[in-house]
Amino acid sequence: MVQGLKLGLKASAEQFGPRDLVELGVMAEEHGLDSVTVSDHFQPWRHNGGHAPFSIAWMTAVGERTQRLQLGTSVMTPTFRYNPAVVAQAFATMGCLYPGRVMLGVGTGEALNEIATGFKGEWPEFKERFARLRESVQLMRDLWTGDRVDFEGEYYSTKGASIYDVPEGGIPVYIAAGGPVVARYAGRAGEGFICTSGKGMDLYTEKLIPAVKEGAEKAARNFADIDRMIEIKISYDTDPAAALENTRFWAPLSLTAEQKHSIDDPIEMEAAADALPIEQVAKRWIVSSDPDEAVEMIKPYLDAGLNHLVFHAPGHDQKRFLDLFERDLAPRLRALA
């Protein structure tokens, strides 16, 4: 039994242009999904065939075309190329337009997106990036009260700042974490927690979920009230060869964490990724042509305590994936709830 099970789709902004990406969000609702999230990259991980439409513009377009989907970023970095006060204003506006449907997923950032837009000096170490993230979240929440805010932090400041159009209760903030330090912060301070699949189950069962629980307990919060989201990388197709080949576009995901966080040029990123063999690329994915096998490979994430499954399909024919998902996988997954 999985309490609060939700199924969503990752709209791959690195793979599809603005119009196709909007239609993908609309199709997600038509296929019965509960949420759709989008990445927020200034540059894609691929130079050839890559895309990078603006997440906030996409969210408003999808919001106008849908009625019930939860919409959000997975994830945005509100700390370098953005001023967090402006991010707070943008999401407050969307929260007024689409009440109860908008969330802000945030992370510590990647050089690929920030250096191209003018960041000077050495790319900061994790300690500074994490400190910036915590400070930006605090500032945004202060602004979502609707009060005048004089904020003087180490990295950001406001003077008599007010956001005049704010939904009641502000905007839910989901914290993305790849390790226990940020996961504890998510448990302490996030309405939601975000992680990604394919890294070995011990990471989730021994590190991430226990850290979220620890953070929640220290803040006297109920762990069950935190939406535990995981992006599940799945290449499902009734044709096994297609299921394997579809992963190739997303070879950059199989680069090391250091490469992904430090390479600042899509051309360099693409060259490094394309040097990887398809077998290594596919290791990060659930690759299957059998629905029962696919669900059996997804179920450990539910057993680990994650309740909000957002599926990232790598193929270019996203309608085919959604059709197959609605027919073969969604009923089996919802039967677990």
From Swiss-Prot:
Disulfide-bond pairs as recorded: none
Biological source species: Rhodococcus hoagii (strain 103S)
Pfam families listed in its UniProt record: Bac_luciferase
Residues reported to bind coenzyme F420-(gamma-Glu)n: D40, T77, T108, G109, N113, G178, G179, V181, V182
GO BP annotation list: carbohydrate metabolic process
Record family assignment: Belongs to the F420-dependent glucose-6-phosphate dehydrogenase family.
Keywords in alphabetical order: Carbohydrate metabolism, Oxidoreductase
Listed name of the protein: F420-dependent glucose-6-phosphate dehydrogenase
Enzyme class per UniProt: oxidoreductase
